């Protein structure tokens, strides 16, 4: 997707070795850098779908803040490529809480908007939960015809179904497991 978006020969990757939490994945699960789009420089960031389908993992919010800070300092647009499976649930406590955590990028988007710096999102694929929120906070949204976003309800649960779509049997099974755990 970067090859289609960025003018040839202008991509300059950033933070490719940045892994402050020393994740077993060896990454913060985002790809970011500077590049020209139609002749204009932009800061570009996207979820790395080769790792956990682009899920939020520890260290990712800090990397995102580095990128949003760069867009603010350079006064150039921030462009997102959004295809995110949500969060790596077993480690969510490591990146949800705190002043520089996963909620901060959304605040930063608002700051950029206030400063007149465009925040754009190219949305593709299935984006439940955290991926969905990431896709709705930018100023301008451009979605692929097959893209979807789910920030709550059945869309989240059906997004977890390997069969795709709304899965009534899967929902009933999840409800039964939840009740069983609650009764223990």
Q: Where are the model-predicted features located?
A:
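A generic structural signal for short coil/turn motifs at secondary-structure boundaries
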Residues: 52-56, 89-90
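A generic alpha-helix structural signal
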Residues: 2-6, 61, 68, 109
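A structural preference for short, pocket-lining loop segments at secondary-structure junctions
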Residues: 31-48, 62-91
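Conserved catalytic cores of soluble enzyme domains
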Residues: 82-184
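Short alpha-helix boundary/capping segments
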Residues: 55-63
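A generic fold-level signal
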Residues: 25-27, 37, 73, 114, ...
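Intrinsically disordered, low-complexity segments enriched in small/flexible residues
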Residues: 1-42, 48-53
């Amino acid at each position: 997707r970067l090859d289609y978006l960025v003018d040839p020969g202008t991509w300059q990757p950033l933070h490719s070795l940045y892994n402050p939490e020393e994740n077993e994945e060896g990454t913060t699960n985002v790809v970011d850098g500077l590049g020209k789009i139609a002749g204009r420089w932009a800061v570009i960031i996207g979820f790395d779908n080769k790792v956990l389908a682009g899920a939020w993992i520890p260290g990712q919010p800090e990397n995102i803040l580095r990128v949003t800070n760069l867009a603010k300092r350079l006064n150039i647009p921030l462009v997102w490529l959004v295809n995110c499976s949500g969060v790596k649930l077993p480690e969510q406590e490591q990146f949800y809480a705190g002043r520089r955590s996963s909620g901060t990028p959304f605040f930063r988007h608002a700051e950029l908007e206030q400063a007149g710096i465009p925040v754009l999102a190219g949305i593709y694929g299935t984006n439940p939960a955290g991926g969905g929120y990431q896709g709705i906070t930018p100023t301008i949204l451009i979605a692929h015809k097959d893209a979807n976003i789910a920030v709550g309800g059945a869309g989240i649960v059906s997004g977890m179904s390997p069969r795709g779509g709304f899965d009534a049997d899967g929902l009933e099974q999840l409800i039964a497991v939840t009740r069983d755990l609650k009764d223990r």
